[in-house]
Amino acid sequence: MLKRTSIAHVNSILEKNLNWKILDIGCGYRANKNASVIADIQDFSDFYKEKKFVKIEGKNLPFEDKEFDFVIASHVIEHIDNFEFFIKELERISSKGYIELPSRLGDNLVFENKNDHIWWFYFDDTANKLIVSKKNQLIDPFITVATAKLFEEIFRESLVIELAWEEKIDYKIDNQIRQENFKKISFFKLF
């Protein structure tokens, strides 16, 4: 099951279940305060001295089946080449969790390394399914990451997708949107 949520709602649940073993994966320096285990491909062990830190090396996540009560993957999946395998790994190590992803709009507005994000996402509210396609840059980015964070306070639901999952992360690959069908929009050229 996959459904929309908010990080505020997720945190309220986590704070009521302090006995849960919670993993925050790929969070860099911004781990969820309720996480008991932090995992990343970079070594942040010096930063997370008060929590268990696990450095990820390779595709397989170094955890036992259903080791965690809850897994947080915020702004991670869009970076992973084999996202399908990663989703299966999340489902293997926990039975529920929270996923946060940039929306297609948010991903097009923000200046980032153009090769950093591989995938585009939107959520089909009728089917409760994550729709995934290769990222297409349809708008010349004009907002910095720092500015986007400020915008998120007001336009969060337009810039990010927040999902809670239990047992299974339902998704569908949809490659119907093709770059060649669009002329890239540049707001700088409009003025």
Task: State what each model feature region is.
Residues 1-9, 50:
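Conserved SAM-binding loop and adjacent beta-strand
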Residues 11-106:
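Conserved SAM-binding loop
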